[in-house]
Curated annotation (Swiss-Prot):
Organism field: Arabidopsis thaliana (Mouse-ear cress)
Assembly, per entry: Component of the CCR4-NOT complex, at least composed of CRR4 and CAF1 proteins.
Catalyzed chemical reaction(s): Exonucleolytic cleavage of poly(A) to 5'-AMP
Residues at which Mg(2+) binds: 299
Name of the top EC class for this enzyme: hydrolase
Single annotated GO MF: poly(A)-specific ribonuclease activity
Cofactor section: Mg(2+)
Record gene name: CCR4-1
Gene Ontology, cellular component aspect: nucleus; P-body
The keyword Magnesium is annotated on this UniProt entry: yes
InterPro entries: CCR4/nocturin_mRNA_transcr, Endo/exonu/phosph_ase_sf, Endo/exonuclease/phosphatase
Protein keywords: Cytoplasm, Exonuclease, Hydrolase, Magnesium, Metal-binding, Nuclease, Nucleus, Repeat, RNA-binding, Transcription, Transcription regulation
Pfam families in UniProt: Exo_endo_phos
Name of this chain's protein: Carbon catabolite repressor protein 4 homolog 1
Family according to the record: Belongs to the CCR4/nocturin family.
Amino acid sequence: MLSVIRVHLPSEIPIVGCELTPYVLLRRPDKTPSTDDVPESAPLEGHFLKYRWFRVQSDKKVAICSVHPSETATLQCLGCLKSKVPVAKSYHCSTKCFSDAWQHHRVLHERAASAATEGNDEEELPRLNSSGSGSGVLSTSVSLTNGSSSVYPSAITQKTGAGGETLVEVGRSKTYTPMADDICHVLKFECVVVNAETKQNVGLSCTILTSRVIPAPSPSPRRLISISGTDVTGHLDSNGRPLSMGTFTVLSYNILSDTYASSDIYSYCPTWALAWTYRRQNLLREIVKYRADIVCLQEVQNDHFEEFFLPELDKHGYQGLFKRKTNEVFIGNTNTIDGCATFFRRDRFSHVKKYEVEFNKAAQSLTEAIIPVSQKKNALNRLVKDNVALIVVLEAKFGSQAADNPGKRQLLCVANTHVNVPHELKDVKLWQVHTLLKGLEKIAASADIPMLVCGDFNTVPASAPHTLLAVGKVDPLHPDLMVDPLGILRPHSKLTHQLPLVSAYSQFAKMGGNVITEQQRRRLDPASSEPLFTNCTRDFIGTLDYIFYTADTLTVESLLELLDEESLRKDTALPSPEWSSDHIALLAEFRCMPRARRNNIL
């Protein structure tokens, strides 16, 4: 007969908005173990499984720490209460916890005071002009549901011991997504075998209790800062979103694939915050809040693209394209191959064309052309690294100043890549970047089209790949060129391109001086004008991610503010409960340049 051997949860700490899926191990009638579901609609030899979720309620109120949400709060920041910061952010579990977070509290107090002065109480992505004043970009909330589970308004009550707790039934499916009403309460999951004919329970039910439900940590909003020195507030669309004529926003974000999110590597991150069920919702909330017109994501697993990001971002008006890594050197489950995903808002752009770059194919062609037969195997082992790039040509649906006449199409080319090559293979990394740029040059030669090159290049400022991108050539004496055992970089004079690429975030260095811009400049590397970091782990901090643009066709209007290391180190490093990737998101607002101004620049 069907029976339940055991049940357990991947994480004992439930978070609001993050689906709970218990692991249920069964013994089938033939005595074999199984984890397959046996619903009432498909009973097994006259029996099926029934699930129920309960909220265990008591009269005792519990506050939880805003930094360590699995811990009970023991003290509260009075400054937060006076500043009308959301009360949940004011709690701490210890004096050390409060002391470590004090600088973060000061930022919260200052922003709350600024918001109160402007009369804006909405949760928002603030937009600041170069004088330091700002207005809000209205954010939208991510809709979270319990799938097929039901919420029952009437309580099923029963006393459970001397504490007088009450069980409130909240769901009847295998999975359950905690809601705000569950915060600070324990959840109880119950699984029992039921006779399909009599509807009576067979044997004892298996139950499991969770820890107290905690709210999803809420990162402090990052501000959008004007670079142009003009008022970028613009007009609000029907969703309350500022729009400047002829401008658009681009987000680039390595979201940290679940495949790479190992507790061995990121042992400082709580297991519940490292779990994909939590991270995917936190990442989605962050991405949606930015309301970018174009979103370039790296390290997106193909199953996560199809089953989560594509349908969820579709609800927010995005169309998505995906390029998975090639699998010539992949070993294991093909469902866990990651790649690059590019999304765009359907009301702002339409899809015209897609190009896919597979560096493995380029490596094979290169090997056939220049590598002696005796060295081909070793050459391929060095060159084949499974990386890809996704290049998308879009047509703008909004007004643009770049057109000579109102009827001309405004096209845009967006390249999205992840150059994941070991640090010591400097020749391979530079060769892949050069290969991508040569492909983009061909597209540029066929059309007068603005270009964006986004992604995680895994290369720091002043390295040969970064120099090639930003300067258009590499000095023959650059130390990176010393690593070239296959001779693929020779002659060095070929390491050039003609695209007028500029790093968007380098424009922070050119802004006029005020409190806001000085703060951002302190977060730039003075030598390269690039951010001090876009990747922050316990063992490494540095810049690996970039948004490059063609400076003869586009100008930067605004940039998403950079984060400071101190605020991230309160959780040791990234990822953390607040930020669910080991990288930070980069976002820039661009304006298409009028042709007359292009000619003056040229």
